[in-house]
A protein has these predicted regions:
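Central antiparallel beta-sheet cores of small beta-barrel/beta-sandwich binding domains
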Residues: 24-119
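Bacterial N-terminal signal peptides that target proteins for export
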Residues: 1-8
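Sec/Tat signal peptide C-region and signal peptidase I cleavage site
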Residues: 18-23
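Bacterial N-terminal signal peptides
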Residues: 8-17
Length: 119
């Protein structure tokens, strides 16, 4: 079984917090995510797509997460997968989003920025 990368964890922390309480949110749909490392020993960049339906994100590697997306579009979240942890914040507006993330894999620390674009 392929282990989730720190990028997937960071993505989960930014998108996964959508909950049933935000059903049929303004953020439902398919989103392309791009993560860029600015500091640390993570991959330089990572891209993948997630789907949000009725306010719930679907991606096969989401494990433990908590957080939320406010009606204003403000995003705050964190996720843990095995020895990896990431947290992030930012904002969604219309069909795009952006923010910052930071995390660790074992004793290694990484940080950077993320962008999102609705398909």
């Amino acid at each position: 079984m392929k282990k989730p990368s720190l990028w997937m964890i960071a993505a989960a922390c930014l998108i996964a917090p959508l909950s049933a309480a935000h059903a049929r949110s303004a953020y439902d749909g398919s989103w392309d995510l791009a993560f860029v490392t600015q500091s640390g020993a993570c991959d330089p960049s990572y891209n993948f797509t997630v789907n949000v339906a009725d306010g719930i994100v679907t991606h096969p590697n989401l494990v433990r997460f908590k957080g939320y997306v406010a009606k204003s579009g403000s995003v705050h979240a964190s996720v843990t997968v095995q020895d990896k942890f990431a947290s992030g914040s930012g904002r969604f507006a219309g069909t795009s989003g952006r923010g910052k993330w930071s995390g660790r894999a074992g004793s290694s620390r990484c940080s950077g920025y993320w962008t999102a674009q609705r398909n």
